[in-house]
Amino acid sequence: MKREWRKIVGVVAWDEGTARALDEAGVDLISVGDSGAASFDELLVFCAAVRRGTVHAVVSCDLPEPTVDAARRLADAGADLVKVEGVENVCAIAAAGIPVFAQIASSAEAKPMEDVGAALIDFRHSGPEAGSEAVAAVSIPVLGGLGGGPWLDGRMRAVYKLLGGALAAYADDVRAGRPVKGD
């Protein structure tokens, strides 16, 4: 998508129904996050559920146990990519033939992650300067959530944050007597 100059739309979700709605809406990447202190076994269940609800989108899953065996288990559960931090972890998992969504905290980490086999990068809290540096340093897409912006190749956002904004707009429209999209 980076080569096509098309921004990547990513959303974090944990269940089949939400994944189906996101997939039908044209979301490019659905990521199963480990926020909420989910255990590894719970992530396997969430990953399988998201895979069942997804036809077109790429599915990634956070890897709290950065081992090749754990990465294989997530791939077997339906993850197209596993999301992990640390260049050594990315290197080992990519060398095992499992596509990696690398998580970084500074622009200096972007190129080493690409060099060891990352397919995609999640750069949280990037800001315009550091984010632009990371994007320029690599040929793979660099996404971001909080602190990200148009300088990145795409964005990640948790579904509940998107849903909250959409529901607030819906409530405002109904209360103001405005037409509601989809009527």
Language-model features: where?
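Conserved, mostly hydrophobic/aromatic
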Residues: 15, 22, 50, 100, ...
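Glycine-rich, proline-tolerant flexible connector loops at the mouths of alpha/beta enzymes
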Residues: 18-46, 65, 81-93, 118-133
